[in-house]
Every structure is written in structure tokens, then in C-alpha cells.
């Protein structure tokens, strides 16, 4: 293997010496134009508005017009509806609701679960594929049951929600053969219940979901323990062996054949890396071969559990001083998921990466 590697290097040097043409990176001009329209100022405006609602805890008020999850979801719906009016009938938006009873865990009152969904209908009647981009609009303080205290949630997951809104803003002006769904889900912090509701409905209706891009915590460039500051890398988490309809015999055969890395989720992650790095400059997409961070979860999981192909997209360096923290200053350290800790150029790149992948997938 080492000799082969040396031969490849030598051949590369040889051919470049004799004037071989450089590799040309192919881009779809229409998609490249959409990528260029992703705006850090627009993303900042989306997140500023989301933060202004004080808290977006799933258990918070739905009747107050200026505070709580109800006000936030109504604003997101208003954005989707505004884009729908300019789409020539291609985009439609709605509140997707379901009743949820107290579960003795993270829900202590009856809820009307409400996801905000915008659908860009595919132009090809024979193409039934559906691609989903998701972020969760809800957030939490240190106590997940605290529904009244301030919880800015700028990054977790204002960043993912803003990316969804921005992609809808730009992509709704175009048409694609396949259908794209933009969704801001609720109930993530309460146990992935909003995405669970959507995934279960998709399974029951036999929706042909080809891929789910779940964006969660993707807008900050620094970590609190290593002090790394880097806005050039983003992680994509993908599962190997799926728990969906996986029996022991199939698992053993997969292991015997060495096919753990051939799962649809891992193939999607590879596609995301190749496409995203082709369209977005100065961004390295790091594939992480595990479903999620250690002992963590996200809204891609309910889809995976029902047999759909899904991945999680997350910033490279997380800062736990700015996740699920009550806003405060302690021992000179500023805690809280505040907008001041966001890097909007980094979020622009990560949003553009999502858009480039959605557009290429829906046109393929």
C-alpha cells in the first residue's frame, strides 16, 4: 500500500510537470447563484427576531403575541407565507398540529404540538421523492421545565431554524423536480416529540423521504474547553447500522462483509461533503461516523428509527457555556446562548452548504 501511494504521488508530480490541465470544479450555475444569495445579515435578522420572544420553551405561552413559543411559531409561519406569495404558487405553508398528553418526563401539561412546515412542491409529477431540511425552534434554560424564564436560544437552535428560513426564502423562487420541505419543529428539548410526530406521519402515509438534513447548533465558531476558534469546519453525523428492522442475522452479515460504512446515512454524508465543499469556499465538512455526539440526540433520530435516511449537521467546536445555560456572569465567565456569541459568516457558509445539497438532490 505504501509503494502504491508513492507511485500515485510520483505520477501526480509527473503529470503536473508536463502541463496537465487543472481539475475543473463543476457547478450548476443556477445553484451557484442561489448559494451566493445566502446572506449573513438576513440570518442575523432571523435570529434576532427569534431571540426577541424571550423564551421558546415548548411548554411556554401560546397566547401571548410577543413572548413564547406561540409568538415565535406564528412569526416563522408569517415568513413562510410571505415567501409563498412570491413563489408563484410553488410554496405552501401551514401549522402542523397534534395533541400530546403529559408523559411524566418532560411534558407535564396537555400540549398541542405545532411544527411550522413549508412545502416546495416538486415540478415533476412522476418524481415522488421528498427532501427535508429541519431545525428546532424550541429551546430551554438549565431546567427544561422552566417555561417562563428568559432563554435566548440564539445558537440552539436559532441557528438551524434561521438556516431553514433562509433556504426557504431563496429556494422558493425556483422550481425543482422533487419536493423540498422546510420545517421548524417544536418539542426537541422535550424529547424529540415534534420530529417524532412528523416522522411517524411520514411513515404512515408512505412518504418517499429520500433525505433529512437536520441542522442543530451550527452558528458559533469556538469551544469553551479547548479555546479553539475556527469557522472553517462543520460536522456531519451519520449512522452505520440502522436499528430499523435490523435482526441479528442481518447485523452479523453486515459486519462480516464490512458494510457498516455503506449505510444510506453514511452515503448521504459523503454526498454532503463532496457537494458542500464544491459550492462553498473555505469550508471543510468533517464526517463523523456515529449517529450523534456522545449521549446526545437530535431531530434526525426519529426519522432514522423509522427507516429514513437522515443526518445531523452541527458546528465543529461546541461551547457548553452557551448551551442550556441560564444567562448570567459567574467567576468572570459569561453564560447563556446569546446572539453575541454567534459567527454569522460561519452560519452563512453552513446554510449555503445545506442549500447547495438540497438543490442538487432535488434536481438529481
Where are these regions (language model features)?
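N-terminal capping segment at the start of a domain
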Residues: 21-68, 280, 322, 330-337
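Alpha-helical metal-binding/catalytic segments enriched in His/Glu/Asp
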Residues: 118, 133-192, 354
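Second-shell loop/turn segments in exported
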Residues: 29-38, 56-69, 102-107, 146-157, ...
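Metal-dependent peptidase/peptidase-like ectodomains
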Residues: 185-298
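Active-site-adjacent mobile loop/cap segments within catalytic or ligand-binding domains
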Residues: 51, 220-238, 286-363
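Structural recognition of the beta-strand scaffold that forms the well-ordered cores
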Residues: 43-52, 59, 92-95, 115-119, ...
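Bacterial Sec-dependent N-terminal signal peptides
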Residues: 1-23
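A non-catalytic alpha/beta surface segment that caps or lines the substrate-entry region
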Residues: 42-121
Amino acid at each position: 500500500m505504501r509503494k502504491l501511494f508513492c507511485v500515485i504521488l510520483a505520477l501526480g508530480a509527473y503529470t503536473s510537470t508536463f502541463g496537465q490541465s487543472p481539475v475543473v470544479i463543476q457547478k450548476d450555475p443556477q445553484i451557484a447563484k442561489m448559494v451566493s444569495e445566502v446572506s449573513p445579515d438576513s440570518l442575523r435578522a432571523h435570529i434576532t427576531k427569534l431571540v426577541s420572544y424571550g423564551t421558546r420553551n415548548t411548554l411556554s405561552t401560546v397566547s401571548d403575541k410577543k413572548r413564547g413559543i406561540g409568538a415565535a411559531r406564528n412569526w416563522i409561519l408569517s415568513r413562510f407565507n410571505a415567501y409563498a406569495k412570491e413563489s408563484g404558487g410553488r410554496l405552501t405553508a401551514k401549522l402542523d398540529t397534534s395533541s400530546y398528553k403529559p408523559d411524566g418526563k418532560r411534558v407535564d401539561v396537555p400540549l398541542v404540538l405545532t411544527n411550522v412546515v413549508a412545502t416546495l412542491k416538486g415540478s415533476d409529477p412522476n418524481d415522488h421523492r421528498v427532501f427535508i431540511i429541519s431545525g428546532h425552534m424550541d429551546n430551554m434554560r438549565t431546567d427544561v421545565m422552566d417555561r417562563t424564564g428568559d432563554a435566548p436560544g440564539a445558537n440552539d437552535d436559532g441557528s438551524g431554524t434561521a438556516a431553514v428560513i433562509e433556504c426557504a426564502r431563496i429556494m422558493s423562487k425556483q422550481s425543482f423536480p422533487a419536493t423540498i420541505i422546510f420545517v421548524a419543529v417544536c418539542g426537541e428539548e422535550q424529547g424529540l416529540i415534534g420530529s417524532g410526530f412528523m416522522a411517524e406521519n411520514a411513515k404512515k402515509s408512505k412518504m418517499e423521504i429520500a433525505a433529512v438534513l437536520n441542522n442543530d447548533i451550527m452558528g458559533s465558531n469556538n469551544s469553551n474547553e479547548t479555546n479553539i476558534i475556527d469557522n472553517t469546519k462543520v460536522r456531519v453525523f451519520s449512522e452505520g447500522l440502522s436499528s430499523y428492522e435490523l435482526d441479528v442475522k442481518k447485523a452479523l452479515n453486515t459486519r462480516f462483509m464490512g458494510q457498516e460504512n455503506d449505510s444510506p446515512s453514511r452515503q448521504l454524508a459523503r454526498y454532503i461533503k463532496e457537494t458542500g465543499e464544491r459550492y462553498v469556499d473555505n469550508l471543510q465538512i468533517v464526517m463523523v461516523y456515529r449517529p450523534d455526539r456522545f449521549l446526545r440526540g437530535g431531530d434526525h433520530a426519529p426519522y432514522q428509527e423509522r427507516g429514513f435516511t437522515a443526518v445531523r449537521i452541527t458546528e465543529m467546536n461546541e461551547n457548553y457555556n452557551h448551551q442550556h445555560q441560564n444567562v448570567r456572569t459567574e467567576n468572570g465567565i459569561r453564560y447563556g446562548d446569546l446572539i453575541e456569541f454567534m459567527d454569522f459568516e460561519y452560519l452563512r457558509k453552513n446554510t449555503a452548504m445545506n442549500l447547495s445539497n438540497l438543490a442538487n438532490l432535488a434536481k438529481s
